[in-house]
């Protein structure tokens, strides 16, 4: 989910439903491999579709998810936390001490930063709009700029609030952003 990875990390692209930061769209298009972890990879009108031609590594705890809607090259059946720990261990052992890998990582981080800056510039007018009544993107931006991210849990209601908040709220710690998936009735985004 959105708050499983600190979005201040220079390698963070953000997360997606029907809306997403520009970084998600760019790297979803540019990548040759997608690593999906803790996801059913279900094709839905409420999420993004993985473009054809991508190599997919799919980690899930439910064997019925594998090859359900997408053909995957590698399936990793197991607990997401354990799979991630093993993947991180593998990357550290094989790539983290390699100078070429470190140089490539720095280039990628620089590219991600540039795309984030472009995207922020494109949205600046709406995010800081003086419109009256207040523009919903301005409201989301004000919330994002004024909360204590480490000690606040942000959520949204169904419909447009989800699409307006998800790309612009910065999730920092696990559980700091709780998104309600797919379709819920207005006013019932949080289980009662």
Question: Where would I find each of the regions flagged by the language model?
Answer:
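Glycine-rich, acidic loop regions that bind phosphate or pyrophosphate groups
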Residues: 2-111
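Active-site diphosphate/adenylate-binding microenvironment
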Residues: 113-191
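Catalytic alpha/large subunits of respiratory electron-transfer oxidoreductases
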Residues: 1, 33, 149-153
């Amino acid at each position: 989910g959105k708050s499983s990875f600190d979005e201040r990390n220079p390698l963070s692209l953000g997360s997606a439903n029907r809306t997403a930061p520009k970084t998600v769209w760019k790297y979803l298009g540019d990548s040759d491999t997608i690593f999906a972890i803790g996801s059913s990879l279900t094709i839905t009108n409420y999420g993004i579709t993985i473009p054809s031609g991508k190599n997919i590594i799919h980690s899930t705890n439910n064997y019925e998810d594998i090859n359900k809607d997408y053909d995957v090259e590698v399936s990793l059946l197991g607990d997401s936390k354990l799979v991630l720990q093993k993947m991180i261990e593998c990357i550290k052992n094989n790539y983290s001490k390699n100078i070429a890998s470190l140089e490539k990582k720095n280039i990628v981080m620089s590219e991600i930063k540039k795309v984030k800056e472009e995207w922020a510039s494109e949205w600046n007018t709406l995010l800081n709009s003086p419109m009256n009544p207040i523009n919903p993107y301005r409201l989301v931006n004000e919330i994002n700029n004024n909360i204590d991210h480490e000690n606040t849990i942000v959520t949204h209601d169904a419909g447009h609030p989800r699409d307006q908040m998800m790309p612009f709220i910065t999730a920092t710690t696990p559980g700091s952003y709780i998104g309600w998936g797919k379709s819920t009735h207005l006013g019932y985004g949080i289980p009662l």
